[in-house]
Design a protein with these regions (language model features):
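Short hydrophobic alpha-helices and adjacent helix-cap/hinge residues
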Residues: 1-123
Length: 123
């Protein structure tokens, strides 16, 4: 149980970082709720987890990710050998924040952070 595992971090963790693990994603709201109770900030790897309860995420823009993926698929569909299509690294990262979730987790986001971030609460 993800919520129970989150509660076991009480006094043992200053922050929780989540990736796109299937167990965490399927129970994200329960984990975020437990983190709120404990005032442990949740930092995620994707925008949608911020919408679901994380304080912030520094991740790739899904549109850009899809565009790069589409370019790779296009090359394969045009008879380029899969073995010659090199993996791509996404270097342009976007900061997503939720002041609402930050407050619930005991975090104050500075004006400087808010200035440079996409506030998912505004969307």
């Amino acid at each position: 149980d993800v919520a129970m595992a989150t509660r076991s971090l009480d006094g043992r963790a200053d922050v929780i970082y989540t990736s796109l693990d299937n167990n965490v994603v399927s129970a994200f709201e329960a984990m975020a709720s437990a983190a709120n109770e404990l005032k442990i900030p949740v930092i995620a790897s994707d925008e949608f987890s911020v919408r679901r309860g994380a304080t912030a995420a520094l991740g790739v823009n899904d549109y850009d990710f899809g565009r790069v993926t589409g370019e790779m698929v296009y090359r394969v569909l045009n008879d380029e050998a899969v073995a010659t299509v090199k993996p791509q690294v996404m270097n342009d990262l976007t900061l997503y924040v939720s002041p609402k979730h930050a407050q619930a987790q005991g975090v104050t986001l500075s004006d400087e952070v808010l200035k440079d971030a996409i506030n998912v609460d505004d969307q």
